[in-house]
Amino acid sequence: MLDKIRESSKYLAPFVKGEHTIGIILGTGLGELGKSIEIEHAIPYMAIPNFPVSTVQGHRGELLIGSFGGKKVIAMQGRFHYYEGYSMKEVTFPVRVMHALGVKTLFVSNAAGGVNTNYLVGDLMIIRDHINLFPEHPLRGKNIDELGPRFPGMAEAYSKRLIQLAEEAGNKLNIPLQKGVYAGLQGPSFETPAEYNWIRVIGGDAVGMSTVPEVIVARHMNMECFGMSVITNSTASEELIKTNHAEVQD
């Protein structure tokens, strides 16, 4: 894996001028946020050595290098999912490459189903913690000591410092924010009513099919992480809302 990381980062290095310490992953239906980035380079995933190519509608498949809010950033416009058939190492490979390029802080976003009965469609949820329900762990296999420890701690997977800053910004701008636990499942089928109820019982506030593997790998490399979910469908009513992918993208 190290050779692949080096090959990919070597290809991208000429596009990364100066210090880019912030990485961003734009999830399903959130690719349009890429328009807020002052783009210097937009590199298709298919052009980057060893990168997978997203097969999901709503994921454009470009690595954006530029500035956002006065900060130099590297942003993924579209991510990879375990349900697409990729291994966990392939799903999380771009995070490894970001780290090799100097990224120290990772911002992840996703579209999620609201499990908490107080959540409404359109709510923004700061991820304070996650529940890993994927069948494969991204760190399974021989550990690469150059990247991180064999048994990384997850006591603070999501930075309390960044969560506090986000809450302060939300209060200042009068943007209501939820804060909760994200449950990550394999997919691609959406959850049954019984599964939603079970996730609620074990402490989940929102559910989706991404984010958790990327954050685990980022923390393995001691990157500071912040996560945000957009609640695109709700299970607050007794009758489960019929969910489809087009709805989740909207």
Region locations from a protein language model:
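Glycine- and other small-residue-rich loops at beta-strand/loop junctions that grip anionic moieties
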Residues: 83, 151, 155, 184-188, ...
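Short acidic/His/Gly/Ser-rich catalytic and metal-binding motifs that mark active-site loops
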Residues: 134-136, 234-239
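Active-site/ligand-binding-proximal alpha/beta "capping" segment
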Residues: 163, 168-205
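A C-terminal functional module that forms or caps the active site or interfaces directly
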Residues: 193-237
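His/Asp/Glu-rich mid-to-C-terminal helical/loop segments that flank catalytic regions of hydrolases
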Residues: 236-250
